[in-house]
Design a protein with these regions (language model features):
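C-terminal catalytic "cap/lid" subdomain
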Residues: 1-269
Length: 269
């Protein structure tokens, strides 16, 4: 199997229970799969959501905060908790992790983006698994003020990271098995797209609204991420995060989820 540079994005609904507390069993299964793939020689970057949801539960709040400063507080508390668990779980497989928190300005500014690329490169060379999240404590302020470019969701962030790091594969672990011609949660006869070569207007029209209340990403954000990844020469797969063991087959090219095929380099140029 060819060694690959792989970016895996995991959503809030996969990482947490309905209460917002961390789903440790789900995290354990994900970490085991990523550690296995890393042990096979692949380079792994994990983009994780969930900071605000986890912080909300950790602070004993009854619902996701609406006030800006409370969102920032929840994000700070939740991110600390999540990194503690990731460090512990990956450590059980003798894997080191590094935290990277990003804002839109970090990837938009050419100088900062180049420094960021160098940091990723150094970490991967040393066998470290970068764990990436948007810096919600800062980015929330940007969303409110409009002073800076805002990433807004981790589907987009993961695609930007994949493009920046020239990844071979981006996998979005979601609460759905892939891209369908209708919402499979309300249409049992919905058909899954196995491969997507072009993001046609018809496909874009099929994308629904936001996902679960605990996250911000729906299918529309995933297709937006697919465009970024495909144009950078990176395959992207949308699949169900409830089955992290599917990552093994996805890396081998098996028909799992929906694979959005990278544009050929001559098409990108």
């Amino acid at each position: 199997m060819k060694k690959q540079r792989i970016v895996v994005k995991v959503g809030t609904s996969t990482l947490t229970h309905d209460s917002g507390s961390l789903n440790l069993r789900s995290m354990e299964h994900l970490v085991r799969a990523l550690a296995d793939l890393h042990g096979c020689g692949n380079e792994i970057i994990l983009v994780t959501s969930g900071a605000i949801a986890v912080g909300t539960a950790r602070l004993g709040l009854s619902e996701r905060p609406r006030e800006l400063r409370m969102k920032q507080a929840a994000a700070a508390v939740g991110q600390c908790r999540m990194m503690h668990i990731y460090d512990k779980l990956f450590g059980e497989y003798n894997r080191s992790v590094a935290q990277i928190l990003l804002t839109g300005d970090d990837v938009e500014n050419p100088d900062r983006a180049e420094h960021l690329r160098s940091t990723f490169s150094a970490l991967l060379e040393m066998g470290v698994i970068p764990v990436v999240n948007e810096n919600d404590s800062v980015s929330s302020a940007e969303i409110e003020t409009g002073h800076h470019k805002v990433l807004g969701d981790n589907d987009t962030l993961s695609a930007i990271v994949a493009a920046l790091c020239q990844a071979d594969l981006l996998v979005l672990l979601s609460d759905i098995d892939g891209l369908y011609d209708a919402d499979p949660r309300t249409h049992p006869d919905a058909k899954r797209f196995h491969q997507v070569k072009d993001l046609t207007p018809e496909i874009l029209e099929m994308a629904g609204g936001a996902g679960t209340w605990r996250g911000t990403g729906g299918m529309a954000t995933k297709l937006s991420a697919a465009r970024i990844a495909m144009e950078s020469g990176c395959d992207m797969v949308i699949t169900n995060g409830a089955r992290p063991e599917d990552l093994y087959g996805i890396v081998e090219g098996q028909d799992i989820g929906t694979r959005c095929l990278a544009r050929k380099k001559e098409d990108v140029l």
